Amino acid sequence: KTPITVSRLLLDEMEDTDNVEHLKTEMIYIEGYVNMALSYLKLFNHERDMDITSVELDKVINPILKRYSRIFIRNHIGLIYENRGDRVITDAKWLSALLEQIISNAVKYTKNGKVKISFDREKNRLVISDSGIGIRSEDIPKIFDKGYSGFNGRLNQKSSGIGLYMVKKIAHKLSITIDVESEVGKGSSFFIYFNELHRKNGV
């Protein structure tokens, strides 16, 4: 068992108090950072472990939502997401790493709000929106830069400056395009466009 798993089991055996709940939430973040670090190392280790195939989005998204369910509850975040069986042509493992970063940011910077996840079949794009603190317009062009945490990251002291940089690299690996719209105090939307050639060629 990993130290994280052991710590989680010990916390589960303890009486639920505010401190224990806080520690359980922090364990989710720690596990997320570990997953991010492992994905980061694999990404730059020149591994050719791509498996481009037809992937059901629900099977990628639902495990991520389950991992972060405690934070959804703790931060009083409503989730708008419908399992529809939509499929895309991509690599499931790398897509999961990409989506986890975006979803974890959404719940990290949203309180008493909502997160919405939807798929536009016509445009072959996944949209992840939140009603969180938003991103300053001057920060948006830089959020995918390595080490850049922006004003919100410095304010909340929760940003590694690596997550969205890794998202950009994975997106390039998967031939995915990402657009971002955001307004401070109103929230952010990430538009994830899947490769049209993959869809047309069925590869």
Please name every model-derived segment.
Residues 130:
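Acidic ATP/Mg2+-coordinating residue in the GHKL
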Residues 135-148:
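Short conserved segment of the HATPase_c
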Residues 174-176:
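Conserved glycine-rich
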